[in-house]
Amino acid sequence: MIASLAAQSQQPVQPDLKALKVRQQGAWSSGDYAIVGTTLQIVGEQLCEALDIRAGQKVLDVAAGNGNATLAAARRWCDVVSTDYVPSLLARGRNRAAAEGLSIR
């Protein structure tokens, strides 16, 4: 019994990443993220300003949410690719970009 427990404790624990991703997607898409995202809009602008992002640069926004940093970079004429694992948030970002006449991918 002790030898069996010792052998089990030496095996690394493998997290179920797929299940974790599904739970996180559910959490981020369950509420009205637009309310939270709107309060963070200035952060996207400040981030682009702090990084001195300029026209023509390539920008990858990972965990883009509803696109605050994506749109801030696109307003600076950057080539922006936006990604998030919550499709509804990406759709909001695309809609916001379209409303401003901005090009994002």
Residues of each region from the PLM?
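Class I SAM-dependent methyltransferase SAM/SAH-binding core
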Residues: 58-105
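Conserved class I S-adenosyl-L-methionine
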Residues: 6, 11-54, 68
